[in-house]
């Protein structure tokens, strides 16, 4: 009996000394059928140390990332969003906002929003992730921008492909088209950030608080209305797209 207990103790001690699975391994396991897409990214960057580390950073954090989307394309709220008028003279007062009136009328037809949760780890494509990494590194390496902040800051505040639970989109392309001309001024990043904050197009509309989903960057750019959260997300992504570290916070 004593010999058996000694054996069990040794086995237990052996397994307790084994290293835990890495965050990367856990993420790849959670990807399930989508694992191959993520492994394509790792293989693509196997000879580039920094970009490989960046890919690992995104994949390791991916299990907690997801989008909140309308259940299907027939969702009345989502369809109405595309046809909202950009002119709303009393946007600050929800009781007089034309946007609020539109969503109030929809709530009588569709009382509850119908959502679905889509996990990034299960749908992320290698093409999307590689494009995001390449675009982020391109602006980071431009004209000595990298000297202003560390690689760790780059991974945390420039590299991420989302800020909340918005739909995945090619927001870097859109933002670069709008703000790419600021790239030549990045030796003064604080001035650039201040200028963009003063000029960016998304305006507050209290009526948008009645919209039950989160807009994509392109939707915000097109509609030019949003909540405080929308405006914050739009500015954060705009700054990241040109290589200025940015994040959102609750005040």
Walk through the language-model features, giving the residues of each.
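Generic structural signal for short, flexible, solvent-exposed coil/loop and linker residues
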Residues: 3-6, 118, 160, 217, ...
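Generic hydrophobic-segment detector
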Residues: 6-7, 24, 198, 216
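Active-site neighborhood of thiol-dependent amide/isopeptide-bond enzymes
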Residues: 182-251
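Bacterial Sec-dependent N-terminal signal peptides
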Residues: 1-23
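N-terminal accessory/pre-domain segments preceding catalytic cores
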Residues: 17-197, 220, 241-242
């Amino acid at each position: 009996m004593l010999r058996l207990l000694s054996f069990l103790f040794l086995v237990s001690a052996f397994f307790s000394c084994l290293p835990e699975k890495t965050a990367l391994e856990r993420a790849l396991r959670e990807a399930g059928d989508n694992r191959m897409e993520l492994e394509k990214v790792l293989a693509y960057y196997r000879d580039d140390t920094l970009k490989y580390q960046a890919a690992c950073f995104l994949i390791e954090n991916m299990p907690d990332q997801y989008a909140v989307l309308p259940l299907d394309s027939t969702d009345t709220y989502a369809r109405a969003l595309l046809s909202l008028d950009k002119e709303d003279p009393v946007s600050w007062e929800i009781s007089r906002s034309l946007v609020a009136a539109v969503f109030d009328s929809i709530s009588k037809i569709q009382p509850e929003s119908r959502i679905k949760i889509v996990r990034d780890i299960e749908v992320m494509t290698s093409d999307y992730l590689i494009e995001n990494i390449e675009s982020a590194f391109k602006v980071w390496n431009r004209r000595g921008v990298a000297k202003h902040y560390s690689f760790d800051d780059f991974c945390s505040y420039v590299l991420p492909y989302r800020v909340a639970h918005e739909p995945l989109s090619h927001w870097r392309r859109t933002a670069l088209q709008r703000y790419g001309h600021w790239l030549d001024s990045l030796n003064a990043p604080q001035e650039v950030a201040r200028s963009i904050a003063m000029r960016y197009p998304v305006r507050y509309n209290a009526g948008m608080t009645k919209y039950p989903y989160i807009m994509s960057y392109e939707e915000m750019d097109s509609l030019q209305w949003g909540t405080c959260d929308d405006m914050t997300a739009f500015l954060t992504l705009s700054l990241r797209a040109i290589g200025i570290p940015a994040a959102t916070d609750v005040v």
